[in-house]
A protein has these predicted regions:
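Accessory terminal and edge-of-domain segments that mediate assembly/interaction
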Residues: 1-218
Length: 218
């Protein structure tokens, strides 16, 4: 049996609309083009073939949209005997929305806490009680922000390595991100938000995941 490839970094993305051609970009194509991930590895049990950079020992995967596809794809990758993930770092790279009162368009946010927001209740905004600030609350509770908080998050709250997240944020805090004319024009429409008018930057956030539209909370 051939020796398993030692992997240093796994880049996990959810979707890509046009990996090979076209002007539409999802979450994976720029990784393929710019890192680059220039080798294709067949991955019959996954959503799409894998991409690999042998010099950097970096592998990239498109997991597919939704919890079921993501779980199946990552399980298939983790159990694939062709790869050794013993010392690998996992970078989950996704697109999320952001409150325009908190950050500009196009930031890169490093996340310490990940919350699975599928496991929750939500009611029609027209029926939210007047004293509530939101109509969204977790399973096992009867109202938003009800105490006490579950000690272990009941399996839907995950904390990533805080030291690694802090180090990564420090390392990229002064990184100058792209700020093309189209992006500047888009944020100029938000004239009342001082933070949104700033150029994009690297920041820290919490990820609310697995909703129809992911959200980064600052």
């Amino acid at each position: 049996m051939a020796r398993a490839l030692p992997i240093r970094v796994v880049v996990v993305t959810m979707y890509e609309s046009a990996l090979e051609t076209g002007n539409h970009f999802g979450e994976f194509r720029l990784w393929v083009e710019r890192l680059p991930l220039n080798e294709r590895i067949p991955f019959p049990y996954g959503f799409r073939d894998l991409r690999y950079n042998s010099e950097k020992s970096v592998i990239g995967i498109v997991s597919g949209v939704g919890t079921a596809r993501a779980a199946a794809s990552i399980m298939a990758l983790g159990m694939d005997p062709r790869f050794d993930f013993t010392r690998a770092y996992w970078l989950v790279a996704g697109i999320a929305g952001v409150n325009p009162l908190e950050a500009s368009i196009g930031p890169a946010a490093w996340v310490e806490w990940v919350v699975d927001a599928d496991l929750a209740f939500e009611i029609d905004a027209r029926e939210i009680p007047a004293e509530w600030s939101t109509g969204y609350w977790p399973l096992g509770k009867t109202r938003p922000y009800e105490q006490p908080v579950e000690a272990d998050g009941a399996g839907w709250v995950y904390r990533l390595d805080p030291g690694l997240v802090t180090w990564t944020h420090w390392l990229t805090a002064d990184l100058r991100l792209d700020d093309p004319p189209a992006l500047r024009e888009a944020r100029s429409r938000y004239s009342t938000s001082r933070r949104l008018r700033r150029r994009p930057l690297c920041c820290a956030a919490t990820r609310l995941a697995a909703r129809p539209s992911g959200t980064a909370l600052f």
